[in-house]
């Protein structure tokens, strides 16, 4: 699933290509991609709207829309497992997994391609709070780059639970946007074993973990995200962070720090990669 850096990369691409452009029409090819309203009303709602801003909240993308200078609601998107946008010309042949296509002025088209078909879109009327329609937004914790995401906040939240620290980091109510890749990478940088109970984290470890999370996410955003399977930017280019990964996706390969083979284990149904020497189990 695309995580914060991948979604931020997409947001930047959407901003570059579609900001201030007017949507002139479109087609929904898979109705369940549109969570609300109906596919027909969704297309009507976006018709002749201009995109004023693309925002990101956790793994959600939010476009503020206007029509003739007046607010026209919010277009929300969650890529889920394999969703991706492709900016192209209308004459470009459709791929098998194209779910939504939207035409824009300037003879351009934005296509939503989703192999697994879990991605979702919403349109929120201008008189409704966005969180009342896209309810997952109300459950998100702070952004990793937000001032409120401090070491103290992190430790206070973690000390209430005995669940493994890796599992805790995947909880979007703790911090928004972190997934499997960057949880593994952050724990490695901090020297914390993924099975460490959350309530055992020391003050110093919490400080180092917060710093590692910010550093890892910043590095990945700078590299355009990570591509291990389906992620691409709007032009079809892979993310470049994968080649820099310390542990994720490197099972049995030597640790870049000490040479010990990277190990992999399952936690709550999710794979975790770690170095048994750099991240000893306490």
From Swiss-Prot:
Catalytic activity: Hydrolysis of DNA containing ring-opened 7-methylguanine residues, releasing 2,6-diamino-4-hydroxy-5-(N-methyl)formamidopyrimidine; 2'-deoxyribonucleotide-(2'-deoxyribose 5'-phosphate)-2'-deoxyribonucleotide-DNA = a 3'-end 2'-deoxyribonucleotide-(2,3-dehydro-2,3-deoxyribose 5'-phosphate)-DNA + a 5'-end 5'-phospho-2'-deoxyribonucleoside-DNA + H(+)
Cofactor-binding details, from the entry: Binds 1 zinc ion per subunit.
GO biological process: base-excision repair
Record-annotated active site: 2 (schiff-base intermediate with dna), 3 (proton donor), 59 (proton donor), 270 (proton donor)
Domain of life: Bacteria
Pfam families (alphabetical): Fapy_DNA_glyco (PF01149), H2TH (PF06831), zf-FPG_IleRS (PF06827)
Binding site for DNA: 97, 116
Keywords associated with the record: DNA damage, DNA repair, DNA-binding, Glycosidase, Hydrolase, Lyase, Metal-binding, Multifunctional enzyme, Zinc, Zinc-finger
Signal peptide: none
Single GO MF annotation: zinc ion binding
Cofactor(s) in the UniProt record: Zn(2+)
EC number of this enzyme: 3.2.2.23, 4.2.99.18
Zinc finger (FPG-type): 246-280
SMART domains to which the protein is assigned, alphabetical: Fapy_DNA_glyco (SM00898), H2TH (SM01232)
Function: Involved in base excision repair of DNA damaged by oxidation or by mutagenic agents. Acts as a DNA glycosylase that recognizes and removes damaged bases. Has a preference for oxidized purines, such as 7,8-dihydro-8-oxoguanine (8-oxoG). Has AP (apurinic/apyrimidinic) lyase activity and introduces nicks in the DNA strand. Cleaves the DNA backbone by beta-delta elimination to generate a single-strand break at the site of the removed base with both 3'- and 5'-phosphates.
Oligomer status and interactors: Monomer.
Family recorded in the similarity comment: Belongs to the FPG family.
Official protein name in the record: Formamidopyrimidine-DNA glycosylase
Organism: Synechococcus sp. (strain ATCC 27144 / PCC 6301 / SAUG 1402/1) (Anacystis nidulans)
Chain's gene name: mutM
């Amino acid at each position: 699933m695309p995580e914060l850096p991948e979604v931020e990369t997409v947001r930047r691409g959407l901003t570059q290509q579609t900001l201030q452009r007017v949507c002139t029409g479109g087609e929904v090819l898979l109705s369940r991609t549109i969570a609300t309203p109906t596919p027909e009303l969704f297309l009507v709602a976006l018709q002749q709207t201009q995109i004023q801003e693309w925002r990101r909240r956790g793994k959600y993308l939010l476009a503020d829309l206007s029509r003739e200078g007046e607010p026209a609601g919010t277009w929300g998107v969650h890529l889920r497992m394999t969703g991706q946008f492709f900016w192209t010309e209308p004459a470009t042949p459709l791929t098998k997994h194209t779910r939504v296509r939207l035409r824009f002025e300037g003879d351009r088209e934005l296509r939503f391609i989703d192999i697994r078909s879990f991605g979702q879109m919403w349109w929120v009327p201008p008189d409704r709070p966005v969180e009342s329609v896209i309810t997952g937004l109300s459950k998100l914790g702070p952004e990793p780059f937000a001032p409120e995401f401090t070491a103290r906040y992190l430790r206070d939240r973690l000390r209430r639970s005995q669940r493994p620290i890796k599992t805790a980091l995947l909880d979007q109510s703790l911090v928004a946007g972190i997934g499997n890749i960057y949880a593994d990478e952050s724990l490695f940088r901090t020297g914390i074993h993924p099975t460490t109970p959350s309530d055992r984290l020391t003050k110093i470890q919490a400080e180092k973990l917060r710093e590692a999370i910010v550093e890892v996410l910043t590095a990945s955003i700078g590299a355009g995200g990570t591509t291990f399977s389906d992620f691409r930017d709007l032009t079809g280019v892979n993310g470049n962070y994968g080649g820099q990964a310390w542990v994720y996706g490197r099972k049995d390969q030597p640790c870049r720090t000490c040479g010990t083979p990277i190990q992999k284990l399952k936690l709550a149904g999710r794979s975790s990669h770690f170095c048994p020497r750099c991240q000893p189990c306490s």
